Amino acid sequence: MNKKIIFFDVDGTLVDVRPAREYVPESTIKAVRETRKKGNLCFLCTGRSLAEIYPHILDVGFDGIIGAGGGFVTIGDEMLYHKKVSDKDVNRVVDFFEENDYDYYLESNGGLFASENLVSRLEMITYGDLENDEKARKKKAEQPSHFITSLIEGESMYRSDVNKICFLENKDIPFQTIIDNFSDAFNVIHCTVPSFGD
């Protein structure tokens, strides 16, 4: 019998892409488990860092992970490869984002570290006006976002364990400014998470 290696993306493939309702369908869980029983290998292949690969995803059962857009590779519990952003480059980006009022987070395998105003901005985008709207508070209580609840606030943003850096748009600064400032050290990618707006 020929063994196969099958790679599964997470967002929009393995799980529903709406963060407030993220789940893995039972049919997918069954298919992955049956595939592995036949001797095939199943790997996650995702842009997510380990801290964003929640237990309900890992519990499906995978042989390994290619995560953080290729930033790390595991087989079982063994880390085969892990490329982190240099301290110098993290510091450069954090300084720029703080000086220019960006909302951002640092992705590491140990956590997702949020800038000061990121969580409140994401909650406004995801749920609505929590302070003044009962429907928004009800939505948050009934459909909490795995992503937002996993963000860690109040920690130093000058870290040595960063896989990737993600940010929300600052309407006062063109995206090209980010490319101009950081393309020497980063692949700067403009992307959209549908639930967080354009």
Can you describe what each PLM-predicted range is?
Residues 3-20, 44, 93:
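Asp-based phosphoryl-transfer active-site loop
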Residues 110-198:
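Conserved acidic, metal-coordinating active-site core of Asp-based
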Residues 7-8, 12, 72-74, 155-158, ...:
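Short, basic/glycine-rich phosphate-binding loops at helix/coil junctions
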Residues 14-18, 74-77, 196-198:
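A short acidic, helix-capping loop that chelates divalent metal ions and anchors anionic groups
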Residues 1-3, 39, 101, 160-162:
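A general structural motif
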Residues 28-130:
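Active-site phosphate-binding/coordination module
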Residues 22-24:
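A short acidic/small-residue loop/turn micro-motif
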